[in-house]
């Protein structure tokens, strides 16, 4: 059975622990695309985080970002956008503050090129480098 799609997580899979793209991984992705296999980079992070990584690969890719809420091509064309509506987001934020201690709540306004976050503990090792 032929392979049609390879979906690759970025952090710790495509990139190494220093957030660098190993040459062997770059070559493998380029070879897969050359063979006609669609490659998708997948991350819970923002499109702006994934875009430079896609540029390093230098081949046409799909990017699944924002924990799957947004699917874009490497050049920024939106294929799918499924975000929380304003009312639901407001309800979640108002209902859960005691459960979100130290958790980042990010509002990503790409058209305005701004990121607004409620609180991020920058000393937490899981948060460093996230945005």
Model-predicted regions and their roles:
Residues 69-131:
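HAD-like small-molecule phosphatases
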Residues 29-52, 67, 105-107:
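Substrate-recognition element of Asp-dependent hydrolases with the DxDx(T/V) motif
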Residues 4, 18-35:
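Basic, amphipathic juxtamembrane/active-site segments
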Residues 4-18, 92:
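Asp-based phosphoryl-transfer active-site loop
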